[in-house]
Amino acid sequence: RTPKDYYELIPSFSRNTNIIEDQIEMTKKILDGADKDAFTMGTLHGMCASGIHPLERMGEGYNYDQVRQMQVDFLRWDEKKMLDSMERIADGMCILAERYIKDAGVDSVYYAGLGAETRWYTDEEFAKWIKPFDLKIMKAIKDAGGYCFLHMCKSGLNMKRYDEDYAALSDVVNWGVYEAPMSLEDGKKQFPGKTILGGLENRSGVLVDGDEYDVRREV
């Protein structure tokens, strides 16, 4: 498999592309059954995650680590073809973000950023290959009138990659304090003036084994 194969796999997106239409219709149906006073949120996998999903279709049995490494290797192999492909993906995500807010009527978008793990990209590669797309999509969320929730995925992160440019486009910031190397207190310093969203472990601990009292105490 080569970057050329990837390039040929990625389509151009429009407002009426089937996958976008389907997502908006599904979102509308969910909102129809929700409390009208509820604060609502759509989710977008970030540029890095959305960019690896096509790689999963390029071969049988590729696991997560393999496609993560393929993305890095392909970018180092043929930067132009990969960035052209990723631009098309980002354009589709911008359209979906806008339609989430303007057409479906959600209040916010939870943007799940990925790529800051030091095991994959260098700081320079992240800044060149991932960050510009992240910011483009986050700006589309803001321009559409929605609140932007930035989630910083995974462990082993260089949290400094999510710098003031990310902060400027975020209303709320969230990360896994149980795995990312940053406490809530340090996060408040890195993202001054932003709402910090905490959370609990979701694969073990009180959410899995505790009762209501345990959950309340942990919160």
PLM feature spans:
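Alpha/beta catalytic barrel-like cores
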Residues: 1-18
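Active-site loop segments of alpha/beta catalytic cores
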Residues: 14-219
